[in-house]
């Protein structure tokens, strides 16, 4: 397990990645909006200009006039439902991304709250460190005792094995 500062750094890195992914998603998938109130301003015209390299759908068909009307009728009737579905999908994705950012922010807040801060005096922090050092010494002593006990049990088992092996070899003679 890592310490709280490392966890905090990892969470902050993840939050930055989430912000970046969210902004990228919005830039890629959202409808362009007006930059100012005048729809005929240069900035709005530039923002709504066609993207170079993207082919526009041809408005003329190769068939007769009646074919144009049926194609136009189909595209008009299919377009609103597709657009509504795309907007719904966009909104759902934005809600998901927003929820992820909120949860990560709360996790960061919890990590920050768990750090010793302004409300903890340096003396109390030193006392806490000293208490932890004493606990560590006690645990280390207990570990050494257990290692010595293990070594004694191992020697006892070895002596039992030697006695059994000696007894078996003497009984065969």
Curated annotation (Swiss-Prot):
<keyword id="KW-0175">Coiled coil</keyword>
<dbReference type="InterPro" id="IPR037212">
    <property type="entry name" value="Med7/Med21-like"/>
</dbReference>
<dbReference type="Pfam" id="PF11221">
    <property type="entry name" value="Med21"/>
</dbReference>
<comment type="subunit">
    <text>Component of the Mediator complex.</text>
</comment>
<keyword id="KW-0010">Activator</keyword>
<comment type="function">
    <text>Component of the Mediator complex, a coactivator involved in the regulated transcription of nearly all RNA polymerase II-dependent genes. Mediator functions as a bridge to convey information from gene-specific regulatory proteins to the basal RNA polymerase II transcription machinery. Mediator is recruited to promoters by direct interactions with regulatory proteins and serves as a scaffold for the assembly of a functional preinitiation complex with RNA polymerase II and the general transcription factors.</text>
</comment>
<feature type="region of interest" description="Disordered">
    <location>
        <begin position="30"/>
        <end position="88"/>
    </location>
</feature>
<keyword id="KW-0805">Transcription regulation</keyword>
<dbReference type="GO" id="GO:0006357">
    <property type="term" value="P:regulation of transcription by RNA polymerase II"/>
</dbReference>
<dbReference type="InterPro" id="IPR021384">
    <property type="entry name" value="Mediator_Med21"/>
</dbReference>
<protein>
    <recommendedName>
        <fullName>Mediator of RNA polymerase II transcription subunit 21</fullName>
    </recommendedName>
</protein>
<dbReference type="GO" id="GO:0016592">
    <property type="term" value="C:mediator complex"/>
</dbReference>
<comment type="similarity">
    <text>Belongs to the Mediator complex subunit 21 family.</text>
</comment>
<dbReference type="GO" id="GO:0003712">
    <property type="term" value="F:transcription coregulator activity"/>
</dbReference>
<feature type="compositionally biased region" description="Low complexity">
    <location>
        <begin position="50"/>
        <end position="60"/>
    </location>
</feature>
<keyword id="KW-0539">Nucleus</keyword>
<feature type="compositionally biased region" description="Polar residues">
    <location>
        <begin position="67"/>
        <end position="81"/>
    </location>
</feature>
<feature type="coiled-coil region">
    <location>
        <begin position="123"/>
        <end position="155"/>
    </location>
</feature>
<keyword id="KW-0804">Transcription</keyword>
């Amino acid at each position: 397990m890592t310490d709280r500062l490392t966890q905090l750094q990892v969470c902050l890195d993840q939050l930055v990645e989430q912000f970046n992914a969210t902004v990228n998603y919005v830039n890629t998938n959202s409808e362009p909006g007006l930059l100012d109130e005048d729809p005929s301003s240069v900035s709005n015209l530039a923002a709504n200009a066609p993207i170079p390299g993207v082919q526009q759908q041809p408005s003329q068909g190769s068939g007769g006039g009646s074919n144009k009307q049926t194609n136009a009728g189909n595209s008009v009737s299919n377009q609103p439902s597709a657009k509504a579905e795309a907007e719904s999908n966009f909104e759902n994705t934005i809600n998901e991304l927003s929820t992820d950012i909120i949860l990560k922010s709360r996790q960061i807040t919890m990590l920050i709250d768990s750090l010793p801060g302004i409300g903890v005096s340096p003396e109390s922090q030193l006392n806490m460190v000293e208490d932890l050092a004493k606990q560590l010494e006690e645990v280390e002593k207990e570990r050494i005792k257990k290692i010595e006990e293990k070594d004694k049990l191992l020697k006892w088992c070895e002596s039992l094995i030697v006695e059994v092996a000696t007894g078996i070899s003497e009984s065969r003679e």
